Amino acid sequence: MFKLALTLTLCLAGSLSLAQHNPHWWGNRNTIVHLFEWKWSDIAQECENFLGPRGFAGVQVSPVNENIISAGRPWWERYQPISYKLTTRSGNEEEFGDMVRRCNDVGVRIYVDVLLNHMSGDFDGVAVGTAGTEAEPGKKSFPGVPYSAQDFHPTCEITDWNDRFQVQQCELVGLKDLDQSSDWVRSKPIEFLDHLIELGVAGFRVDAAKHMASEDLEYIYSSLSNLNIDHGFPHNARPFIFQEVIDHGHETVSRDEYKDLGAVTEFRFSEEIGNAFRGNNALKWLQSWGTGWGFLPSGQALTFVDNHDNQRDAGAVLNYKSPKQYKMATAFHLAYPYGISRVMSSFAFDDHDTPPPQDAQERIISPEFDEDGACVNGWICEHRWRQIYAMVGFKNAVRDTEITGWWDNGDNQISFCRGNKGFLAINNNLYDLSQDLNTCLPQGTYCDVISGSLIDGSCTGKSVTVNEHGYGYIHIGSDDFDGVLALHVDAKV
């Protein structure tokens, strides 16, 4: 009887973790966008006016719970919580709930960035949060939850990243480290996450997951409610979980400890794709991209070119400030069938602490758009760049097809097909790509969705004529604005 009970328990745990890898996308949609620091009302409008019509699958939103108010309002104050009240500079609970429903109604799922590891770091005296709650972080006193000193690990600093105890029980950059082995501490985030599920979210990005023991997270995840069927989710659907675990391949706390609980952020993807498109690694080697590079299995990997943290760091990671390479890398990311894809939507920054666009009263301002739909008032909105949203459409069009017809010039010019539905070519050399290449597409003329759009049967950019054998003449000049060309069956002239 004991063996039977144990078997049933293990099967249930396995099925729950497997379910937590499902992002619950509509139809053939399969790209998430991180609308970093956007207001809830603006996200609702963006779902209805742009993301839904353009085929985006979901939005990762900034933390929703009350945070400390820091001088100058740097972006990272959102990662210093003092309660679980749903009031931030992005809006209140009513506005959040309205946004979730409106986005779900147009097939765009919402994933919340959640902070389970810690509360706010030290603050001189009494801190007041975005909902008006008072706390004394220096005393580990957070009455808005409530948490007190006994709910936290003893104060210590992480000085050795190869020491598991320090990584998981000391304070990450001074943030007060919660003791998730405590039943009381576990109960509060479970209540918080369940409330968000009730409001209709599809899942969670778990910040600083590697700083929490995997067994504690497993308990929290398995205790959560199923998704809300009133928002279009099937019965018994589990929240999609993706966890921030920075693992460069030599970490004491490994991504492998978390991959069965949900997806894991594959930071090596970001670093290596940046290396390649910065010219530090030949593109020809990308033929084996994915697990061939030591990355996680595709269904367990949350993939990205950059995120809100590493786009601010020096190094190989690409960001909007290198637009040609960034667009090429993003095109490859969305065209190659590996991982659960997320694209970044940033605001302009000059230094690490730059706040989101705000007015004189330090209120976040809404994005404004020019006649082409691009953002103009401090918001970068990479997701509105044609070269990126067009690749979201490409990814939708070629879903469930494999890589075929790989070609390269032995260096930094590559092309490949996605079944007989799509074709991508990239030129990262300092000379032109001019070649008859196998596109694998049915005979006809196709619009290059990178350089233009198919409007009323006409292409506003380059077009490629494919012959009866699937071949077409591909030209990407070394000085072309984008360095990439993309064709697919939904853009046939």
From Swiss-Prot:
Residues annotated as binding Ca(2+): N117, Q168, D177, H211
This protein's source sits in the domain of life called: Eukaryota
Q: What does UniProt give as GO cellular component? A: extracellular region
Q: Does the keyword Nucleotidyltransferase apply?
A: no
Q: Cystine bridges: which residues?
A: C47-C103, C156-C170, C375-C381, C417-C440, C447-C459
Q: Where does chloride bind?
A: R205, N307, R342
Q: Which residues does UniProt call coiled coil? A: none
Example GO biological process = carbohydrate metabolic process
One protein family per Pfam: Alpha-amylase_C
Against InterPro entries, the record matches this protein to: A-amylase/branching_C, A-amylase_C, Alpha_amylase, Glyco_hydro_13_cat_dom, Glyco_hydro_b, Glycoside_hydrolase_SF
Q: Does the keyword Disulfide bond apply?
A: yes
Family the UniProt entry places it in: Belongs to the glycosyl hydrolase 13 family.
Name of the protein described by the UniProt record: Alpha-amylase-related protein
Q: Which organism is it from?
A: Drosophila yakuba
